[in-house]
Structures are given as structure tokens and as C-alpha cells.
């Protein structure tokens, strides 16, 4: 026979479960469609997973936007499509040419001498429907003039924009977020912009993101894991707060990446671009014939000894507080490149300054980073130790493998990798 205490315990559990089931059943059923224009229901806040193992520094693949894709907003699914249409019967002219070459000059001797370039009207259509594609939530159309403040006017004029990439939904900003890539066709010259549409399809903003290809920072537009902030590569957008600018006077942004939900790594190089004694933007200039899409820019990056002594990297919170400063120089070929790896088992990011040091950044507390000079790291020799995990860092200037003790990330051994084929 069961004791009275056991009986009371079982009865209490039964009543508790019954109450929970009753509360769950009390939610009203979904209402049928009404004659009012449909709007997107409020989305539940995104919840971070308990095991935070994602690499937030990974590069975005920049795939063109979805022609017809099922997306999740809060707890509901919707169908999103993005279309780009070019109208070759509606030319758009602009001068001066700036970064655009003679391949896009207006076919007239006088216009060519004046540096006039020609593109064509484009329409960018964003359509959101319910999950089965029957009800239209919104349909929004944008055009090239909407992007005139996001990139140089001459580049916007001639661009054939790929369908904007869908980056996700930010609950805090109430926005569907898109990455837009605006470039001179058949060249490596272009800019990026971040477009925000609210749940009714209204434009919340188009934020310029700076260069996207040649001379680009190591940065892609991103939403923080919780959706509370959006990185546009020139600023951080936050709900109910002004944008947090990442730009500095007399400095070039070289990298910006989320490290965790509330913290970023931001790297600058201090100095200024100074043009040489040439005439930029002229379509009559040498090496700018009718086949040139983007003439070579003739400039130098000028920096001073005092600027070269300044800390270049910051661990920056999304509130704008600088948590840590140190010197770090990314790789640079046609664009900046953070030579890096995500050591998931140890919960740390590995950043390599070529030929100098390894910077180990704990994801949970990035301000507690530490630096390990490469010359002082012990060389890896077999056998591999019980808690060591290998992580390769390969870039234009670095080919190294680090064996990190996942229980003590300060214990690192290094191995040089053979040259690439």
C-alpha cells in the first residue's frame, strides 16, 4: 500500500499537469481572413541556444536573393521572393564618371569628353506571402534612385544589381534585412548596402556599407544572434537608439565582425588615401578606352609614424563601449582579410597577424583576449596530446596549423603547412 505522502505527491503532480494543459487549451484559435489588408503578426523574440557554438566571424557567401523561398519570422513561415528587372528602354545618364570606365560612356563624342556614363532603369521587387503563397503580406518595389545615398552615384547608375540577399529578420528592429551589392559590371569595383523593410514592407533604411570587393574591409552585413543589432559594415543599427558609426576620421575600416551577440572586433588602419597628380574621372584619360569597365585608381595610402603607433583593433560592445584595444594588422591583397579560425571545442577565436602573433579571443569574454608571439610558440611534434585539437589558418600570407589545448587555450603548439600547389 502506498504511503499518504506518496499519494499526495502523485495527486499534486496530476493537478499541476492538468492545470498546464488547461492553460494551453485556452489560447484562442486563429481567426479567418478578414477584408482588411494583411499584416505580419508580431514575432516572438529570438532565443539564443544554450550551447553557443556558432562561428560569428564566418564570411557570408553573398548568394543572390531568393526567387521563392520559405523563411521563418518568429514562429511562422512565409514565402519571400526577390526580383530584379532591367528596362533597356529607359537609360539613366550621370556625370562625372568617377570610378566608371569608358565601356559605359554615352555614345557621343561630346558626352564622352564630359565624362557622362549610362546605365538603365532597374526595378527591385520584394514580395512576402503566407506560407502557402495565397495571401500577399506586402509587395514593395525600389529603384536605382533609392540607392543613390548608399554608393557613389556613377556606380549605381551603371550597376546590374543581383537580387538582394536575404539575411534574416531582426525582431528588435522589426525588419527583414537584405544585403545589396552594387558594382560596376565586369569589374571588381563595387559597394554594399544593407536594406531594412518592416513587416508591412516599408523601407526602414538603406545603410551604406562601403566597398564590397576591391579595397573592402573584412566585413559582411550581419544580424546579431538575438536580432537586437545589425552590422552594416559602416555602422551598427540598434532598436530605439541612433546608429553606432564604425568610421573614424583619417582612418580606413579594415575589418568588423561580430564575436558574440553584444560584442564586435573592429580594426582600422590610420592614414588617408591621397590621389596622385592625375585627372580622375575623365573618359579621355589614358588606359580608359571603350573596353575598360573601371580604370585603375591612382592613389597612395599615406600614414605617419605617430599613426602607426596607435592601437588599431578594438573589442567594441554594441552599446558603443570600448572594452579592449590592441594593435593588429590584417592581411591585405585586393581587400582586407582576417586570417582566422574558430576553435569551437575551446570556445575561442584565433586571429593571426602574419609573421608576428596569434591573438586568442574567448567568445564568451572577448575583452579577456591574450596574444602569443609566433616565434615563441612551441613547434608541434607527435604525439598529439589528449586535449589538443588542430585548427588551420590559411590566407594569402599565412599557412599555419595550431594545436590548441581545449582545456587551457594558452597552451598552443604550431605547425607550418606546406605551400599551396
Model-derived features: where do they sit?
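Bacterial N-terminal signal peptides
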Residues: 8-18
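Short beta-strand elements that form the blades of beta-propeller/WD-repeat-like
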Residues: 61, 70-118, 173-186, 219-233, ...
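Repeated scaffold domains used in trafficking and secretory/extracellular systems
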Residues: 67, 153-166, 208-222, 249-262, ...
Amino acid at each position: 500500500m502506498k504511503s499518504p505522502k506518496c499519494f499526495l505527491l502523485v495527486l499534486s503532480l496530476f493537478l499541476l499537469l492538468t492545470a498546464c494543459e488547461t492553460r494551453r487549451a485556452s489560447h484562442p484559435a486563429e481567426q479567418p481572413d478578414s477584408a482588411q489588408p494583411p499584416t505580419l503578426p508580431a514575432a516572438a523574440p529570438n532565443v539564443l541556444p544554450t550551447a553557443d557554438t556558432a562561428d560569428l566571424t564566418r564570411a557570408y557567401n553573398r548568394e543572390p536573393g531568393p526567387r521563392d523561398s520559405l523563411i521563418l519570422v518568429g514562429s511562422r513561415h512565409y514565402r519571400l521572393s526577390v526580383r530584379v528587372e532591367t528596362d533597356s528602354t529607359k537609360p539613366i545618364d550621370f556625370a562625372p564618371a568617377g570610378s566608371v570606365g569608358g565601356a559605359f560612356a554615352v555614345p557621343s563624342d561630346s558626352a564622352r569628353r564630359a565624362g557622362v556614363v549610362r546605365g538603365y532603369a532597374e526595378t527591385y521587387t520584394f514580395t512576402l506571402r503566407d506560407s502557402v503563397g495565397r495571401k500577399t503580406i506586402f509587395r514593395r518595389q525600389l529603384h536605382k534612385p533609392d540607392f543613390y545615398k548608399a554608393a557613389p552615384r556613377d556606380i549605381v547608375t551603371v550597376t546590374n544589381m543581383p537580387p538582394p540577399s536575404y539575411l534574416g529578420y531582426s525582431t528588435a528592429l522589426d525588419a527583414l534585412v537584405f544585403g545589396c551589392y552594387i558594382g560596376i559590371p565586369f569589374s571588381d569595383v563595387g559597394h554594399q548596402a544593407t536594406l531594412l523593410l518592416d513587416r508591412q514592407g516599408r523601407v526602414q533604411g538603406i545603410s551604406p556599407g562601403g566597398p564590397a570587393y576591391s579595397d573592402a574591409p573584412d566585413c559582411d552585413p550581419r544580424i546579431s544572434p538575438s536580432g537586437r543589432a545589425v552590422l552594416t559594415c559602416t555602422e551598427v543599427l540598434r532598436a530605439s537608439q541612433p546608429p553606432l558609426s564604425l568610421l573614424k576620421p583619417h582612418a580606413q575600416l579594415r575589418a568588423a565582425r561580430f564575436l558574440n551577440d553584444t560584442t564586435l572586433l573592429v580594426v582600422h588602419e590610420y592614414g588617408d588615401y591621397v590621389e596622385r597628380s592625375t585627372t580622375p574621372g575623365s573618359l579621355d584619360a589614358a588606359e580608359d578606352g571603350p573596353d575598360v569597365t573601371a580604370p585603375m585608381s591612382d592613389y597612395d595610402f599615406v600614414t605617419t609614424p605617430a599613426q602607426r603607433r596607435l592601437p588599431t583593433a578594438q573589442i567594441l560592445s554594441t552599446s558603443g563601449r570600448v572594452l579592449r584595444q590592441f594593435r593588429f594588422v590584417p592581411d591585405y591583397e585586393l581587400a582586407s582579410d582576417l586570417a582566422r579560425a574558430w576553435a569551437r571545442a575551446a570556445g575561442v577565436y584565433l586571429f593571426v597577424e602574419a609573421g608576428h602573433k596569434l591573438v586568442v579571443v574567448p567568445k564568451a569574454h572577448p575583452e579577456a583576449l591574450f596574444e602569443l608571439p609566433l616565434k615563441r610558440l612551441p613547434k608541434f611534434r607527435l604525439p598529439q596530446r589528449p586535449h589538443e585539437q588542430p585548427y588551420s589558418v590559411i590566407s594569402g600570407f599565412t599557412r599555419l596549423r595550431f594545436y590548441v589545448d581545449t582545456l587551457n587555450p594558452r597552451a598552443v603548439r604550431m605547425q607550418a603547412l606546406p605551400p599551396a600547389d
